[in-house]
Amino acid sequence: MINVKEYSGHIRNWSALCERLGIDHSLSREDREEQILIKAYETWGNEMADHMHGMFAFALWDDEKQELFCLRDQFGTKPFYYYETADGELLYGTTIRQIMEQPGFVKELNEEMLQLYLSLTYVAGEMTFFKGVKKLLPGRYL
């Protein structure tokens, strides 16, 4: 069984995906998009982003494989962050605050990122202002 653990966004080609994946159009937007994520993952696996258009970031848990699959849209419109604790546990969320509120997070300033930002006034790549917290890059999965 696959569960949506985290989701932020909107799938623009939802109607075509509902047709292709056999999902009821009359479901609420929230239920419909959850079903799209689950069925798209079951159908296309890691390649599901190739079939989806919109702005989204999400995490799916596959009970059978005991795997977490996280994906961010191709343009990076919706953010997705992750952090590995000292115990090797993966914390994740669509906001850094979600990660900060979880046990095991160590709040520490990323001085290297701060120096880059003050020099360039731009936050590039996967680094954030918190040490160990990374952004999932646009169009990438984890």
Question: What is the predicted role of each segment?
Answer:
Residues 1-141:
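Cysteine-centered catalytic environments shared across enzyme families
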